[in-house]
From Swiss-Prot:
Belongs to the gamma-glutamyl phosphate reductase family. Keywords: Amino-acid biosynthesis, Cytoplasm, NADP, Oxidoreductase, Proline biosynthesis. NCBIfam families: PRK00197.1, proA. This is Gamma-glutamyl phosphate reductase. One of its GO terms (biological process) is L-proline biosynthetic process.
Amino acid sequence: MQEFLQEAKNSSRIIANLGSAQKNRVLNEMADALIEHSSFILSHNQKDMNDAKLNNLNDALQDRLLLTEKRIQDMAIAIRQIASQQDPLGKILNGWVTKDGLNIQKVSIPIGVIGIIYESRPNVTSDTAALCFKSGNVCVLKGGKEAENSNKAIATILREVLRKNNLPEYAISLLPDSSREGVAKLIKQDKYVDLIVPRGGEALIRFVSENSSIPVIKHDKGICHIFIDQDANITKIFDIVVNAKCQKPSACNSIETLLIHTNIAALILSGLVETLSLHGTILKGCPETLQHINAIPATLEDFDTEYLANVLNIKIVANVDEAITHIQRHGSGHSESILSENYTTINKFLSEVDAACVYANASTRFTDGGEFGLGAEVGISTNKLHSRGPMGIEDLTTFKYKIYGQGQIRKG
């Protein structure tokens, strides 16, 4: 593995110093190549889908794994959007002159070699490769075993574009050892790798966080909530809740729990249940909720569960403070939303809820690099340091200080 990672590290100097025009041209060629070779990708994806069925992978995971012509087109569009963005490198973030006449500039630079560990979704391969390339970074990708054929096909196409442009193919690499042991070895290679970004299940995140000797930015689970305040606009509630839960239940930005102010619960619960039942949502409720509707009794464990399925907890709360306390206790710091027309309550919620993304009168489903206008994302960071929320190209940079002098020496 060391030889492989040394090649990746050697590539980083070349990639870090590419000009914006060259990077954008190569990215657009990558997008073209994905479309041109879509049948090649789909044939390899079919192998993964066949294996998924044989291994009884659940429907949510199979949906994440599936590629179609439309999804490949979306992958290409995401790469073009990344290419169209402003280059994040070489920006003067700050500058000043010291009392000794030193001209100091704080300038954005690439992080270096980034290891990205992910599961199921093959589009992550092209998204993260493009984001890293645009931001001058080299990526070492470790996808899930269930998507091995798809990931290899996509990486092969992207690497061929690099080769045709006389650029090092190791700038986009799949980890040769895709086993758990391979991951365990990768996350100890701090001599070669500068950052690890794991995105996937809770067990993967915990394993990487506890064992890595390399800095980690986590794409952790999404236990997201919507709080319906007593001053909510009833005409907005139903569409937002259905979108946040039912549009894509397997997404990390879908909600798992609905918190409802006690003063509005009786007015909206029956209508909500009727609407959600039309979408096949399984409901679990707290004792007070069960006084209004028929639902499965919710346990304490349910409020700590990321279902990744069309299941929704409902809890009635006394006020916004109880809602915030519940989110603080059970949320994962991902995305939280309040539905209200009361500015004071909204401001309190947005200020006091500790999460990467906090919304007022909108669905949590917008927590996404594409929806934020970032083109794509490496992940949705639930960390508080370096990066938080959807990680676009700006979040894949660090900085250095450039100091210009005229012969100054330090005295004293």
